[in-house]
Amino acid sequence: VTGADVVRVARSLLGVRYLHQGRSRAGLDCIGLPVLVRAELGLPDLDAAPGYARTSTAFEMLDFCRANMVEVAPAEIQPGDILVQINGVGRHMAIVCDYPLCPDSLGIIHAWLPNRRVTECRLDDAFMQTVRGCFRFKEIAA
C-alpha cells in the first residue's frame, strides 16, 4: 500500500455526506474517513473511537494515532499521511493529498461538518498552525 493508494481511495469518497460517527459511503465523519479508507484498502481496522462526542477536552485522537501509526515531522508529510488538528476544544483529522489546482502545494481530504460532506482543499499555513500531530499508516513504506 502506498500513500497514492490512500489518496486514490479518499478521493473516491469526495462528496459523501458528513455523518457524525459515520463509517460507510452512506456517511462519514473526520475519523470515519481514514477508517473507511483503510477498510477499502484491506488494512486492519484501527477504529477505536466509538461513541465519541463532537468536541472533546482530552487528547484521545492524538494519543490513539501515536499508539497506532508512525509519527512524522510536519516538514516530512506526504500524500496519504494523516493530520490531527486541535483548535480549542475541537479535534479534526484529515488525509494529506497532492493538490492538482496548485501543483506546488499539498491539500487535504476531510469529512468536514461545515461543508456537510467529504471535501478537498489546499493545505494552508493557517490549518498547519493548528496541527498537533502528523502520522503515517504503519503499512505504508516511507
Named regions from a protein language model:
Residues 24, 114, 137-140:
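Short, solvent-exposed coil/turn elements at secondary-structure transition points
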